[in-house]
Amino acid sequence: MDTNNDIEKRILELAKQQVSPIEYENYLSQLKYNPNASKSDIAFFYAPNMVLCSTITAKYSALLKEILSQNKVGMHLAHSVDVRIEVASKVHVSDHSNINYKATKSSIKDSYTFENFVVGSCNNTVYEIAKKIAQSDTPPYNPVLFYGGTGLGKTHILNAIGNHALEKHKKVVLVTSEDFLRDFLKHLNNRSMDSFKEKYRHCDFFLLDDAQFLQGKPQLEEEFFHTFNELHANNRQIVLISDRSPKNIAGLEDRLKSRFEWGITAKIMPPDLETKLSIVKQKCQLNKIILPEEVMEYIAQHISDNIRQMEGAIIKISVNANLMNAPIDLNLAKTVLEDLQKDQAEGSSLENILLAVAQSLNLKSSEIKVSSRQKNVALARKLVVYFARLYTPNPTLSLAQFLDLKDHSSISKMYSSIKKMLEEKNPFVLSLKEEIKNRLNELNDKKQH
């Protein structure tokens, strides 16, 4: 007669043969056979929480019935067997104290705190929500998603939450979606998913940057879905950062969009001139650089919205003044900013331009490469041409092949169309131009590093 452990093992082995590895890891491997409640015509199983219980019942109860009806698991069963899956009243929880959550400190930037986050009307709501999250012992809102354009302080606020939570001796994981994917694939290939789950599903604060990059990766979305469910079911704080609202993340599964909106969503707006000037002054103080008031005002007025670019401009002005042994004045600032903005965008690849335009218009890159009558796609193709003409060498032939244009004269028409809209100060296109430039600068920065 087989032992209860043998029976459970055999059931799971048979189930494992009929589902994908990721399905088995995320669902069926979580089941525990309950011999005390089971009878000849009904088999009871435990799942660790209600989310898994409901999911396994809906997706896999028929499979389990089929396995049991084959009567190959060493049980005395009736011809027809029912399956019941319940939430365990007392699920054995392993000791997670040995997980080195302190190691995640290296992924959290000490310099990003609430104390040095410049607050203005553009970000006050996000700041207050973030402080409340960090200071609370239980999640006041869950999940929380902050979104907004590049360089507006989203990563700063995420790190500030992490730093404050660490001061309270909380277990914190801060990770980008790219690193989450890399870690997931490593553990999957090494068949060490248990340690992956230990790390990500048992922290007090799960902080994810660049959540928009989860889209289009089915395995990653599947794993994140279950990580999210378990964290949420166990009342662990989830904070997500994205460059756009959940509904505008093209290609993201609807079930993830839905979960992202369960709690609270808040947008970081571009800073107004007063806030930008405060940021410039703070960055000067942090970098121990003294600039005349008129130079700080000029930087605030002429750097669009990107805080990282403001800091880069401050440092470059100071360096140039030292190298030239010249005073820091308005003329120097104008020269440096003109060169800086030109340098940041020059050398952009067509791929980066395409990606920046696609992200700004919430399209897939593949959609833009094919001619279409859809207005947003047609506009996107014109914008790719415009930026390619500005920032890539000899773009005509490359562009024709890249966008599948048979007539090279089309490139001139598309470029002229955007140029005319900018000259007419079309507000939508002007806004798009700044957003695309910011995204290009960020993509180019990543390439350099």
Swiss-Prot record:
- What Pfam families does the entry give? Bac_DnaA, Bac_DnaA_C
GO MF, one annotated term: ATP binding
Region Domain II: start and end of each range? Answer: 75-106
Q: Where in the cell is it found?
A: Cytoplasm
Spans annotated as Domain I, interacts with DnaA modulators: 1-75
GO process annotations (BP): DNA replication initiation; regulation of DNA replication
Q: Which NCBIfam families match?
A: DnaA (TIGR00362)
| Designated name of the protein | Chromosomal replication initiator protein DnaA
Q: Organism, per UniProt? A: Helicobacter acinonychis (strain Sheeba)
* Upper classification of the organism: Bacteria, Pseudomonadati, Campylobacterota, Epsilonproteobacteria, Campylobacterales
